[in-house]
């Protein structure tokens, strides 16, 4: 596999909301590293480094976090984003080992177009998989090209990435191909349309005036 991204982390010496705000103001993101029977480790990293990692490698990114000269294999477990700016305010990392299998939620997307007159409804956005920590797929892509009304894709129908095992319910509905619903006019619009139809009918029934 490709070489892992390496990010420098610095142990935190101050804690609390005020300290976290100061870190973010200085271009740093506070993190907590959990896992492997170790006590949680509080660190902070460069904002640009973490944003680039998540943007390029996804929300389940695995990378080397260097703390005090020692590399630690970690994966992103949870991200707290600012609801307005979408900037990462905080992240939880999981300390992992090479060869370890983990359960992760992998994003699901679809590509292609269903048959003419059909509409695609995607019922779930992620599937829970068990995979090797170094083989986590960034996403699962489903081909819906040409699917007809009434066809469905269940979780058990999804082709799993190499060495991945489905953990989600096998019968979970992922994709549903349906007939588009007719858009209902608001009552005011319906009344106006009926009035126009009635007026048109009256005009058609009115006798033509004689020309003298």
UniProtKB/Swiss-Prot annotation:
One annotated Gene Ontology cellular component of this protein: cytosolic large ribosomal subunit
Biological processes per GO annotation: translation
GO molecular function: 5S rRNA binding; structural constituent of ribosome
Region feature (Disordered): 179-212
Superkingdom as given in the UniProt entry: Bacteria
Keyword tags: Ribonucleoprotein, Ribosomal protein, RNA-binding, rRNA-binding
Family statement drawn from the similarity comment of this UniProt entry: Belongs to the bacterial ribosomal protein bL25 family. CTC subfamily.
Function: This is one of the proteins that binds to the 5S RNA in the ribosome where it forms part of the central protuberance.
Self-association state and partner proteins as the record states: Part of the 50S ribosomal subunit; part of the 5S rRNA/L5/L18/L25 subcomplex. Contacts the 5S rRNA. Binds to the 5S rRNA independently of L5 and L18.
Alphabetized NCBIfam families for the sequence: bL25_bact_ctc (TIGR00731), PRK05618.2-1 (NF004131)
Name of the protein in question: Large ribosomal subunit protein bL25
Organism in which the protein naturally occurs: Corynebacterium urealyticum (strain ATCC 43042 / DSM 7109)
Highest classification ranks of the organism: Bacteria, Bacillati, Actinomycetota, Actinomycetes, Mycobacteriales
Gene expressing this chain: rplY
């Amino acid at each position: 596999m490709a070489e892992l991204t390496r990010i420098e982390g610095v142990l935190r010496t101050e804690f609390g909301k005020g300290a976290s705000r100061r870190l973010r103001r200085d271009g740093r993101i506070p993190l907590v590293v959990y896992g492997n029977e170790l006590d949680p480790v509080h660190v902070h990293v460069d904002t640009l480094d973490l944003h680039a990692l998540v943007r390029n490698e996804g929300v389940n990114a695995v990378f080397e976090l260097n703390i005090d000269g020692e590399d630690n294999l970690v994966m992103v477990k949870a991200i707290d984003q600012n609801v307005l700016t979408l900037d990462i305010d905080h992240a939880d990392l999981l300390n992992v080992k090479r060869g370890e299998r983990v359960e992760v939620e992998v994003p699901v997307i679809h590509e292609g177009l269903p048959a003419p007159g059909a509409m695609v409804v995607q019922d779930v956005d992620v599937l829970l998989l068990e995979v090797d920590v170094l083989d986590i797929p960034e996403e699962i892509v489903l081909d819906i090209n040409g699917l007809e009304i009434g066809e469905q894709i269940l979780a058990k129908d999804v082709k799993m990435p190499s060495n991945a095992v489905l953990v989600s319910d096998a019968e979970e509905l992922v994709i549903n191909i349906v007939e588009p619903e007719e858009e209902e006019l608001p009552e005011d619009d319906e009344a106006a349309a009926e009035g126009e139809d009635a007026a048109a009918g009256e005009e058609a029934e009115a006798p033509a005036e004689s020309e003298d």
